Curated annotation (Swiss-Prot):
Family: Belongs to the GCKR-like family. MurNAc-6-P etherase subfamily.
Catalysed transformations (reactions): N-acetyl-D-muramate 6-phosphate + H2O = N-acetyl-D-glucosamine 6-phosphate + (R)-lactate
Group of enzyme by EC: lyase
Species of origin: Lactobacillus johnsonii (strain CNCM I-12250 / La1 / NCC 533)
Name used for this protein in its record: N-acetylmuramic acid 6-phosphate etherase
Amino acid sequence: MNIKDLTTEQRNPKSLHIDSATPLEIVKIINQEDKKIADAVGTQDKEIAKAIEYASKRYREGGRLIYVGAGTSGRLGILDAVELVPTYRINPERAIGLIAGGQSAMFRAVEGAEDDLQLGEKDLKDLKLNEKDIVIGLAASGRTPYVIGCLKYANQVKALTISIACVKKSEIGKYADIAIEAVVGPEVITGSTRMKAGTAQKMILNMISTGVMIKQGKVYENVMVDVMPTNSKLVDRACRIIEVATGVSESVASDTLEKADMNVAVAITMLKTGVDKEKAMDILKECNGNISSVVNNY
């Protein structure tokens, strides 16, 4: 398919005269178009759920979440990877974002990088990609050569491959075990896929990574139990999580968090079972870090 024929490259009839619109009219036009995004993502719920299911299994076996993309898509992948570390207390080496052109491309375009098929393979080889890993390829147009190169190589080593595009029958989808294609329609500004397409990709990434973390036992009821309290705001949040999850007072929550070496999951387990820190850690390990299992079995 030619680039000009892609949905993401079409002109949007609803914004043809946006150049002469007032600021309020601009906001209303963009807002009306953005309302279509959630519905487009909703058409892919079964594929997204499948991605969560399969990725959760690989991650539990020691695999890594590896996001690959160019431009906006690459930056969104890096953002998701980076945020998982403090939110769910995971090893930074288990959530990795790759962008065509390397780290400098995060802040400034690197000409020609996204068109380099071999560069994608090289970047994954440098990470020593293996069959336990999960590779998520992002491309709004569904045709970025760098992403195709990544997915092709990932298939060779039998890693799980997931593609996220904003067009139907995407090129990257041909090289993915699971193809997610949320068609959001033409952008308000023609071809500016950082807008609706970028938002759709971010929503899908939120669902996949959050789902995978939930399945690792990183959430109890609907609160984060593996948050990394690295500053005063997060320490306060950690205490509130313990209060909500166990019903104890603020002072008890704070005291137990300190005894648990600032580990929220361990603190909750201590309060739920009445055991000390060492025993709580053993129990959590037995239950694969899942506090619901701890509560039900102890």
